[in-house]
């Protein structure tokens, strides 16, 4: 890597983009500083000196958010950043996916790409700056890399597509799309959308790719000037005779027939049996030979699966390319929860459970941006037993977080506004069985659970995972991919949406990129599959239940004068805590005076409502109230006309005749009717007993 500082400038979506090399992190294999407006990200790439003896590429991508970038001090006792938050984890995945396919096949050196956000400008995406920085750090290093790549955000505001929308534009955009790729093709897509049609989504993807091309050209100009020297990578030589023998043995033992076993576990058992027979033929050979045999056998499985799909249009389980596995679904299978849905597609099964809570139970997101409140959450769990394996039970990893976020994006678009449905909603999807497309099964199960819970979603959402197998110029697009097709194919393209359009998509590929034609065909085939799945789901439950579960909290909304909010809360929260302690309800008060009262006990809601109404109740001039004497002074008596509201009855207004002492007529605790005669500018209430006595005397005389 060059040790001389160099600065390169261009414009990106109307804002300055600056890439600096040669000054920072000079012991990394590659490092760049990316400035996009006032957003600054340091990206580094480092590789191990020697390769690892593993059968996968050990790439680790880390995106780190430093709170100093936003002028914040971390909370907690230590005042340090802790483990990455969910957004940082998702961004790490976002960067990983487009760069992973661009390393040489068989490369086994550990590679770590780290992007540290050092300054953040809300209008200029640190995520996209980190993606460019990661690409450039690899490109200027000696690490073999077939980039550069770039990524952009695309919004859709009033029918117009926008590159890298600012904060205000993002708030009104019906599309939140991230696209990445190299000059020739797109290789990563992630989006949340408000029922955007397939043709508009494709237009947005290609619109983003046009901008990506400009960024790639800019990066290439930097590479051409720096001229990094790449380390030589020589793939491990293969033993042609050994591979030929493995191929012949596998064919003779019926590998192709074993691959076409319909049931997953039986297929795995049949393939394993053949593998053991092949290994037996090499009995007595050293470990290196057995490793080579295993590697070739796995390669043969991949080749045969791909051949069957591309040439014979037959999938391992016998389905046509566009055929969806058998579907089954149920709702309401758990008696005490607020809503539940079980969705099964072939050998993939997800149980989703919906829980409703008060608005105050929302999740607070305090990252680099403005503090946000999240009232809809979707969590995805993938236990070992779902694939018939054992292992330690750990906290959710990147995959679980990513799949949960995808499901959240897919359904967030149809969740009703809090004014219409004043609840915090959490859905947990437990994958009970998996043979591919489990994230999409969790979306379908979550829709069922929400409808079972009585959440008035705007429209049901279904999800499907599409696959792709390419061979030379030919390709086959697969609907509803299973695990083997995901592992051995070229694409995992997840599409979720309603009947009207897409609400979320996520695309990962293992080849360099996809053309516009393949994307168009995949989106259309996904639409047809999604509608087929939707039809089945609606046959199970056609619309959200009219009533909530008896175990769900009931929430009543009342409106108070915003000026009275402080009275309800009281000094230091004293008043509101008294109400909560007395009734056990959950209270949430909005700045506009909207009060949400939640409890599973309707009588307690009513009790809390009365307490609040008494606090905010306004006295009215001319109204008559039953008053209770609370305090006596020389100049009059202070009476309570209703809970929380006192009035002064002046000594001159207590009796018909003139009195010398208040105590001569009334005592503490006495009750009598008074009429409110005045409310001054400070809100103090004056009342009269005398006025009512005069009216009573007059009425008596008239009789």
Swiss-Prot record:
User: SUPFAM superfamilies of this UniProt entry?
Assistant: Eukaryotic type KH-domain (KH-domain type I), Nucleic acid-binding proteins, Polynucleotide phosphorylase/guanosine pentaphosphate synthase (PNPase/GPSI), domain 3, Ribonuclease PH domain 2-like, Ribosomal protein S5 domain 2-like
Q: Does the keyword Hydrolase apply?
A: no
In its UniProt record, a GO molecular function of this protein is: 3'-5'-RNA exonuclease activity
Residue numbers binding Mg(2+): 486, 492
- EC class, as a word, reads transferase
User: Which reaction does this enzyme catalyse, per its entry?
Assistant: RNA(n+1) + phosphate = RNA(n) + a ribonucleoside 5'-diphosphate
Q: Name one GO cellular component term.
A: cytosol
Q: What is this protein called?
A: Polyribonucleotide nucleotidyltransferase
Gene that encodes it: pnp
């Amino acid at each position: 890597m060059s040790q001389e500082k160099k600065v390169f400038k261009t414009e990106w979506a109307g804002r300055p983009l600056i890439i600096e090399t040669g000054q920072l992190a000079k012991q990394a294999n590659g490092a760049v500083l990316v400035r996009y407006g006032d957003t600054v990200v340091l990206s580094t790439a480092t590789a191990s000196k020697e390769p690892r003896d593993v059968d996968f590429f050990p790439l680790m991508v880390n995106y780190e958010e430093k709170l100093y970038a936003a002028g914040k001090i971390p909370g907690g006792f230590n005042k340090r950043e802790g483990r990455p938050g969910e957004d940082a984890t998702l961004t790490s995945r976002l960067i990983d996916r487009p760069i992973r396919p661009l390393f040489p096949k068989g490369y086994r050196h550990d590679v770590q790409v780290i992007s540290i956000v050092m300054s953040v400008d809300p209008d200029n995406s640190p995520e996209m700056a980190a993606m460019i920085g990661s690409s450039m750090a690899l490109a200027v290093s000696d690490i073999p890399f077939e980039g550069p790549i770039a990524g952009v955000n695309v919004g859709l505001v009033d029918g117009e597509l926008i590159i890298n929308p600012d904060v205000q534009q993002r708030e009104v955009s019906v599309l939140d799309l991230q696209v990445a790729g190299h000059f020739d093709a797109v290789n990563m897509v992630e989006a949340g959308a408000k029922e955007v049609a397939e043709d508009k989504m494709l237009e947005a993807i290609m619109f983003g790719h046009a901008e990506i091309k400009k960024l790639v050209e800019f990066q290439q100009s930097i590479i051409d000037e720096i001229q990094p020297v790449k380390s030589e990578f020589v793939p491990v030589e293969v033993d042609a005779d050994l591979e030929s023998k493995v191929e012949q043995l596998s064919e003779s033992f019926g590998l192709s027939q074993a691959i076409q076993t319909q049931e997953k576990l039986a297929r795995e058992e049949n393939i394993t049996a053949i593998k053991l027979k092949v290994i037996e033929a090499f009995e007595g050979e050293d470990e290196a030979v057995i490793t080579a045999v295993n590697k070739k056998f796995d390669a043969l499985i991949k080749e045969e699966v791909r051949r069957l799909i591309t040439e014979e249009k037959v999938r391992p389980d016998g389905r046509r390319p566009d055929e969806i596995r058998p579907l089954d679904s149920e709702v309401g299978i758990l008696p005490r929860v607020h809503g539940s849905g079980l969705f099964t597609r072939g050998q993939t099964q997800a149980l989703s459970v919906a829980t409703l809570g008060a608005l105050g139970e929302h999740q607070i997101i305090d990252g680099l941006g403005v503090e946000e409140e999240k009232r809809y959450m979707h969590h995805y769990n993938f236990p070992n037993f779902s694939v018939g394996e054992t292992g330690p039970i750990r906290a959710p990893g990147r995959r679980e977080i990513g799949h949960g976020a995808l499901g959240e994006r897919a359904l967030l678009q149809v969740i009703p506004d809090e004014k219409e449905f004043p609840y915090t909603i959490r859905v947990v999807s437990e994958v009970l069985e998996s043979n591919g497309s489990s994230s999409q099964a969790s979306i379908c199960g979550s829709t069922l659970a929400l409808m079972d819970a009585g959440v008035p979603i705007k429209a049901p959402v279904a999800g499907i995972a599409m696959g792709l197998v390419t061979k030379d110029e030919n390709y086959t697009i697969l609907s509803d991919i299973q695990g083997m097709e995901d592992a051995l194919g070229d694409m995992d393209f997840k599409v979720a949406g309603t009947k009207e359009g897409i609400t979320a998509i996520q695309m990962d590929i293992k080849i360099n990129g996809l053309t516009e034609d393949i994307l168009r065909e995949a989106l259309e085939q996904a639409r047809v599959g999604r509608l087929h799945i939707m039809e089945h789901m609606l046959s199970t439950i056609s619309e959200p239940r009219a009533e909530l579960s008896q175990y769900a909290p009931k929430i009543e909304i009342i409106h108070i004068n915003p000026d009275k909010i402080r009275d309800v809360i009281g000094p230091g929260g004293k008043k509101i805590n008294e109400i909560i302690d007395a009734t056990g309800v959950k209270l949430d008060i909005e700045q506009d005076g909207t009060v949400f009262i939640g409890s599973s006990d309707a009588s307690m809601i009513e009790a809390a409502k009365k307490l609040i109404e008494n606090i905010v109740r306004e006295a009215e001039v001319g109204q008559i109230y039953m008053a209770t004497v609370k305090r006596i002074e020389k100049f009059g008596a202070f009476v309570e006309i209703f809970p929380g509201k006192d009035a002064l009855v002046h000594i001159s207004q207590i009796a018909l005749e003139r009195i010398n002492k208040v105590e001569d007529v009334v005592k503490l605790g006495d009750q009598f009717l008074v009429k409110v005669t005045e409310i001054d500018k400070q809100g103090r209430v004056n009342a009269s007993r005398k006025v009512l006595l005069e009216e009573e005397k007059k009425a008596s005389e008239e009789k």
